[in-house]
Amino acid sequence: MDDATPAEVIEVLKRTGMTGEVMQVKCRILDGRDKGRILTRNVMGPIREGDILMLLDTIREAKEIRTP
C-alpha cells in the first residue's frame, strides 16, 4: 500500500445500501498532493469518527444520499 493516502474520518453522515451496510463519511486527507482537502466517501464495515482510512484514489467523491 505504498501509493495509498491516509485520511481521517471527521464525521459519519448516513447509512446507505440495501441493508444499511455502507456508511457515508466526511474525511480529511492527511498527506500527499491533496493534504487538508475534505472528501465525502462511502465506506463498508464498522467505522467511527477518528478512524484512519487508506484511500487509493483521492479524486473520486461520493454523491449526496437523497431520501424520498
From Swiss-Prot:
GO terms for biological process: maturation of SSU-rRNA; ribosomal small subunit assembly; translation. The keyword Kinase does not apply. Gene3D superfamilies: Nucleic acid-binding proteins. Coiled coil: none annotated. GO terms for cellular component: cytosolic small ribosomal subunit. It holds the Pfam family Ribosomal_S28e. GO terms for molecular function: structural constituent of ribosome. PANTHER family: 40S RIBOSOMAL PROTEIN S28, SMALL RIBOSOMAL SUBUNIT PROTEIN ES28. Belongs to the eukaryotic ribosomal protein eS28 family. This is Small ribosomal subunit protein eS28.
